A protein has these predicted regions:
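Catalytic cores and adjacent flexible loops of soluble metabolic enzymes
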Residues: 1-211
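Metal-ion/cofactor- or nucleotide/acyl-coenzyme-handling active-site neighborhoods
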Residues: 208-404
Length: 404
């Protein structure tokens, strides 16, 4: 089998030159490979005819499609209708299982062939495979069409760029598209992690002098205990503990990237474009509450907000560089805080709902959960050397830090 990755990037001359070499090698099969899932019907059929006319008749011709733009099935139908003496191979997988946006679903193409070409496949056997094996795998691993993969394919970019930006969990779809559009042409096809990290940082970066804001925050927290609320499920399971603490200690309460009327907050810290959009769309009752915004967030036109420098409060670890909780703790360190109480900082877990509210849910890359959790825990341990951290609710981040 010979599969030229990214067939769409071959010119006609380059493809014909490759076919000449294939005729010499004489493999079992040669493929059209839609690596980015960006090829339309006319592009696939054009390459088919070009190869079919010039390749040795004994060599089979295959098609390997990806579903970034939901085109794998339609392209397979086009090839299935072409009149040719050559044997055609259509790669497929049950339920489209495959990396990222997935591949051509076996159940769709076999049913199509049975109905429109010739009845030759037992589709119920495919369904049995799904029931016995794929359904369980699907619960553990994500694949299939998503908007970011569509954006990557529409700009003819490697899907891993989209995957990286999705996993940041801080960007709107418009943000993701802007960053992907900024990828230089020569870097689009082959994934460059360092490049996308750099472009993401540049997109988020907006340096400002936040001295005045820091001084004002110093005044707000002076002489008061500080309680940070994150949107973990323990906000519900340990709600009474939190409310009792607030009533007893009268702390300065800061909510991290979410709003909940059930807990009276003195301030909201927002560092995330996606969370900002949610707050704006819901038209939350924010009057009388201070809004602490990082400088990467556009001016919302709200009253009573303070901007702080985004760059200053990120850290050097790219996996958790702009974790909101860590950023806020770094800000409070700069403001002179000596101890901070934490609630709802549960830590992500696989196969569990990690947020107390469905509207706060963002998909988590299960492959990174344990690694990310360990890195956050390491940062918290470093911070606890100069600022005491007390977990008011159970947390997977707990190490040597205290638990109240």
């Amino acid at each position: 089998f010979m599969q030229p990755v990214g067939t769409v990037f071959y010119s006609d001359i380059e493809l014909l030159q490759l076919v000449e070499k294939i005729n010499v090698l004489h493999p079992y099969a040669f493929y059209i490979v839609d690596t980015l899932g960006s090829m339309y019907r006319n592009e696939v059929s054009h390459r088919f005819y070009l190869i079919d006319e010039n390749m040795h008749p004994d060599i089979l011709l295959g098609f390997h499609g990806h579903n970034n733009m939901q085109l794998a099935f339609s392209n397979a139908q086009v090839l299935g209708k072409i009149q040719t003496k050559r044997t055609l191979i259509l790669d497929s997988s049950v339920y489209g299982m495959g990396r990222g946006a997935g591949n051509l679903p076996t159940e769709l193409i076999t049913q199509y062939i049975n109905k429109k070409i010739q009845s030759r496949y037992d589709v119920t056997m495919v369904m049995d495979i799904y029931d016995e094996y794929i359904a369980a795998i699907r619960k553990e691993y994500e694949w299939g069409y998503t908007m970011p993969y569509h954006i990557a394919a529409s700009h003819v970019c490697h899907p891993s760029y989209a995957a990286y930006l999705i996993n940041k969990q801080t960007l709107t779809m418009k943000d993701i598209e802007r960053i992907i559009q900024s990828i230089p042409e020569e870097y689009k096809v082959l994934y460059d992690r360092e490049l996308i990290e750099q472009l993401y940082s540049q997109f988020q970066s907006k340096k400002i002098d936040d001295t005045a804001s820091v001084r004002e925050i110093e005044g707000l927290i002076q002489g008061r205990k500080i309680l940070l609320l994150a949107p973990g499920k323990t906000l519900v399971s340990h709600g009474q503990t939190i409310r009792d603490f607030i009533e007893r200690e009268r702390p300065y309460v800061i909510s991290v990237n979410f709003v909940d009327g059930g807990y009276p907050a003195d301030a909201y810290f927002v560092s995330n474009h996606k969370r900002m959009d949610i707050l704006g769309q819901e038209n939350r009752p924010l009057k009388g509450t201070r809004i602490l915004l990082t400088s990467n967030i556009p001016n919302p036109g709200w009253e009573d907000y303070l901007y702080v420098d985004y760059d200053r409060y990120t850290n050097t670890d790219p996996m958790i560089s702009d974790n909101a909780g860590l950023m806020l703790l770094k800000l409070l360190q700069r403001c002179g805080a000596l101890e901070v109480f934490l609630a709802g900082f549960d830590g992500f877990q696989e196969d569990q709902e990690n947020y107390y509210s469905e509207e706060l849910y963002f998909q988590v890359n299960t492959n990174d959960i344990e690694e990310k959790r360990g890195r956050i825990q390491k940062q918290l341990k470093e911070m606890s050397r100069t600022m005491k951290l007390y977990f008011l609710t159970p947390s997977l981040y707990q190490g040597e830090e205290a638990y109240v």
